[in-house]
Amino acid sequence: YTDVDEWMDSGIEAAFVHVATAAHESVIRSLLERGIAVYVDKPISDNLAEVKQLIDLADSKGLLLTAGFNRRFAPMIRRLKEIPDKNMLFIRKGRINLVEPVRQAVYDLFLHIGDAALYLLDEEVLSVQSKIIEKDGNLKRIWVELETKTASCFVSMNYEAGANQEVMEIQSPEGIVRVVDLTDMTTSDQAGTHLTGFGDWEGTLRKRGFEPLIRGFIEGIMKKENPVTTDSAYLSHSLCEKILQDNGY
């Protein structure tokens, strides 16, 4: 197809949206209004009011609107989720000399690790503290502290880290478990330190959570079950907006 409207009207039942964030709202709305289920690469929109409107539209039509939060489906992160009695969580993302306006950086990149934090926490977040460091309107660093009744979670992102790396660490009375770049797990406890990885033939899409998420979306269309509930997706977008508002953006 050379015309997007012709494509939308061709009888498709679902669509994967991978366009610039600025175009998300109009493209998603057009698809939903035609009765087409949508999988969208994060974010749904960088405008929280638009996120709510699109979620309400999807729900009113009984359609899936699935945000592409692949970390929830990465096997190693699912193992972190299963750890009982978590009391301290550290999530950090580093990038090499990345230059992005603050709002774009928070919604396009921080959103993923913010969502991972909310996914890994087992209770309602009671308080949020945050700090954004920027220069000339571009993000330098950001840190966020989330508190639940029984756990503290620290989330940070550094655009001048000197290395591209993502680390998630869970601490509990049983030990410390750390996952680097979604694939390499280190467990430290009273018995020592243990390394866990994937086999040589394990596919990258599965290791990073994309394969199970996409399968969940396709199966969810038939079952009417969203692998990423719209309530949880909205909560993650709301966290980003709160951070921006609290820091004057």
Task: Describe the residue ranges of each PLM region.
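Hydrophobic residues in well-ordered beta-strands that form the structural core
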Residues: 40, 65-67, 179
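Beta-loop-alpha module in the N-terminal Rossmann-like domain of NAD(P)-dependent dehydrogenases
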Residues: 1-39, 43-55
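A short glycine-threonine-serine/GTX helix/turn-capping micro-motif
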Residues: 101-107, 200-208
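Mid-domain beta-loop-alpha active-site segment that forms a flexible
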Residues: 68-75, 96-125, 213, 233
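Contiguous beta-strand/loop segments that form the cofactor/metal-binding neighborhood of enzyme cores
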Residues: 111-184, 211-224
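C-terminal helix-rich "cap/oligomerization" subdomain common to oxidoreductases
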Residues: 14-19, 63, 216-249
